[in-house]
UniProtKB/Swiss-Prot annotation:
The gene is lexA. It comes from Pseudothermotoga lettingae (strain ATCC BAA-301 / DSM 14385 / NBRC 107922 / TMO). Its EC number is 3.4.21.88. Keywords: Autocatalytic cleavage, DNA damage, DNA repair, DNA replication, DNA-binding, Hydrolase, Repressor, SOS response, Transcription, Transcription regulation. It comes from the Bacteria. This is LexA repressor. SUPFAM superfamilies: LexA/Signal peptidase (SSF51306), Winged helix' DNA-binding domain (SSF46785). Represses a number of genes involved in the response to DNA damage (SOS response), including recA and lexA. In the presence of single-stranded DNA, RecA interacts with LexA causing an autocatalytic cleavage which disrupts the DNA-binding part of LexA, leading to derepression of the SOS regulon and eventually DNA repair. It catalyses: Hydrolysis of Ala-|-Gly bond in repressor LexA. The record marks 84-85 as: Cleavage.
Length: 200
């Protein structure tokens, strides 16, 4: 059984998968380092951890990353657009189906995809037009990235912090301000567990 990934390891694995899908070949160490604003040595440390946990293998040549069990994919519906910025749009009906790696899916939970609009989560490497994988659940821990619906029927993707008298929805963008709402005005739709990026 594969060991569980850290948040950063999961994001790097997601990036590798999306890069391969878009380019037809794996990213280089520098591609990964540039995408996550880390040093090449830092990228190697994360890749070594992913290899040790059984998610990929690496050869001695450049661009030799191979993701294991690549054929294991799950088809998930894209149910609409979610704001990573100001809350702008309620979740809609399914619009398309996209395959996602089985490693992102937790058995016993329902999952769906949302397309991101905006730049409020860029410091978590979630960009405009990315797809986020959401695990359906109505609870969350402080610091989780969640999809929420407000009492004005607007959906947004933010880090959540729960206090007795309020819920703080915090963007991952130092240029933007947190949103504070009463607990009764926030409905948690699910926790983000992965990011899919389609290039081109």
């Amino acid at each position: 059984m594969k060991k569980e990934l850290t948040d950063r390891q999961k994001k790097i694995l997601d990036f590798v998968l999306s890069y391969i899908d878009s380019h037809g070949y794996p990213p280089s160490i520098r591609d990964i380092a540039r995408a996550f604003r880390i040093t090449p040595r830092g990228a190697i440390v994360h890749l070594n951890a992913l290899e040790k946990k059984g998610y990929l293998t690496r050869g001695k040549r450049a661009r030799s990353i191979k993701v294991l069990n690549r054929s294991e994919a799950i088809r998930l519906p894209v149910v609409g657009t979610i704001a990573a910025g100001n809350a702008i749009e309620a979740i809609e009906n399914p619009t398309e189906i996209i395959e996602v790696p089985k490693a992102m899916i937790k058995i016993g939970f329902d999952h769906f995809l949302l397309r991101v609009r905006g730049e409020s989560m860029i410091e978590e490497h979630i960009l405009d037009k990315d797809y986020v994988v959401i695990r359906k659940q109505n609870t969350a821990n402080n610091g989780d990235i969640v999809a929420v619906l407000t009492n004005s029927n607007e959906a947004t993707l933010k880090k959540i912090y729960i206090e007795p008298e309020k819920i703080i929805l915090k963007p991952a963008n130092s240029k933007m301000q947190p949103i504070e709402l009463k607990p009764e005005n926030v409905k948690i739709l699910g926790k983000m567990v992965g990011v899919i990026r389609i290039y081109g």
